[in-house]
Amino acid sequence: MAFKFKTFAAVGALIGSLALAGCGQDEKDPNHIKVGVIVGAEQQVAEVAQKVAKEKYGLDVELVTFNDYVLPNEALSKGDIDANAFQHKPYLDQQIKDRGYKLVSVGKTFVYPIAGYSKKIKSLDELKDGSQVAVPNDPTNLGRSLLLLQKVGLIKLKDGVGLLPTSLDIVENPKNLKIVELEAPQLPRSLDDAQIALAVINTTYASQIGLTPAKDGIFVEDKDSPYVNLIVTREDNKDAENVKKFVQAYQSDEVYEAANKVFNGGAVKGW
């Protein structure tokens, strides 16, 4: 029994050391990187960056797709991926505050303006008293949406709320609108809900059903928005060669042209 235990222990130690060696080698490999992106239009843009990275920098980019805004940072923090490209700074800051992530921005990508869409009305003048307005429920995009609703005159928020107001900060609501908070991926489908008159949707999700801010939005966020998307990695990985190469590939003319094509002119260069 003692012999068997020693044998198993030795084998276990060997397997463990090989696994760790493999992980270390992969992390330090300047020619390979795993990047998290949101499935859909942003994935299409990232695929162009993937091609540029290979052709110009000899970097193999493995894209890992996600369907929501929470998992990409969780996966990055755990080391399952090396970087992600999907979020703006206010969202990243909130995630770091709430979850204690050691994440950092290493480059800017695009501003994807949010806009108000509807299948029930064509202008805000048609919005009836007591109408339901759907907005994203994550803190940063909720705040972003409420600030936009304020800018177009539908509501008024308390002074000094910054970038993260909530529905509780609404002090004036002339049309008695009912703010309905939904998961961001559900917002495009909410347009078919008979109860929802208007939905504020991020370009990433609006594009999945063929909507673009300039063409289909009843109102659109300004292009000088502070919500530029970022390429993010872990603090201990920010100087890695594979990360630097990916940032260079993403911030290329080819990717900019692809983003404008995919989003029908709805992508604003952020670098």
UniProtKB/Swiss-Prot annotation:
A lipid is attached at residue 23 (S-diacylglycerol cysteine). One of its GO terms (cellular component) is plasma membrane. Transmembrane segments: none annotated. This is D-methionine-binding lipoprotein MetQ. Residues 1-22 form the signal peptide. The keyword 4Fe-4S does not apply. It comes from Salmonella typhimurium (strain LT2 / SGSC1412 / ATCC 700720). The MetNIQ system is also to be able to transport the toxic methionine analog alpha-methyl-methionine. This protein is a component of a D-methionine permease, a binding protein-dependent, ATP-driven transport system.
